UniProtKB/Swiss-Prot annotation:
Keywords: Cytoplasm, Hydrolase, Metal-binding, Nucleotide-binding. Binds 1 divalent metal cation per subunit. HAMAP family: SurE. A divalent metal cation binds at D8, D9, S43, N96. Belongs to the SurE nucleotidase family. This is 5'-nucleotidase SurE. It is found in: Cytoplasm. NCBIfam families: PRK00346.1-4, PRK13931.1, surE. It comes from the Bacteria. It comes from Dinoroseobacter shibae (strain DSM 16493 / NCIMB 14021 / DFL 12). Nucleotidase that shows phosphatase activity on nucleoside 5'-monophosphates. It catalyses: a ribonucleoside 5'-phosphate + H2O = a ribonucleoside + phosphate. The gene is surE.
Amino acid sequence: MRILITNDDGINAPGLEVLAEIAAEIAGPGGEVWTVAPAFEQSGVGHCISYTQPTMIAELGPRRYAAEGSPADCVMAGLYDVMNGDAPDLILSGVNRGNNSGENALYSGTLGGAMEGALQGHKAIALSQYYGPAMATADDPFDAARRHGVAVVRKLLAADQWGGPGYGTFYNVNFPPVLAAGVKGVRAAPQGLRSHARFRVEAQLSPSGRRFLWVQGSAQNVPAEQGSDVSLNLDGYISVTPMRADLTAYDKLADLEAALA
């Protein structure tokens, strides 16, 4: 099996090393793991692409590349340049340092990489490690992802719930904020929304009097709807959410059509 991996934390991020281990085991003997990851931190860039400027790419080693662009840029670089058009069997993005459940999924560069893979017609999975108090003193904060990642990916590949008409399906996997031994299981889940979940900006003045705005997030350990990815993660479960890039609110179409008549 040929696997392309990327992330949004950057080429030197420890989560990418974990993902490379997961990918190598999935690929198996004789398989190939190709890495194309951002040269610099790209957290929060979502599904953006470098449309108005070129992306510089550098080879760091065998099948290992860093690109000065977003995760979506990296996926395209892998598909159309690095892998010479020889398509991968699977695209993996992560393992993100921090959760991408709930509203975080909308901002995530990790999901942006997986989404681009799906839009390009490939099987794609995003993997993220929820952080919590257990991680602060852990020798390996990615313990849950490292120990359970291979099994989850294999289950998704075996389920064959891919493709379909229109936008392709990709998967958002979030490992709970516990060590591997504390994981209760794996559950399918819808995307949740934390109560009062809003990003905001706070202003600070530099010594020279210049005004800077810093993005601030909201509390992450806030429960969402029962059974959602957020609530399941906080309860110790790995969540798996099937996703598509289609943003249409289908439940509003009929009423909108009537209002526009």
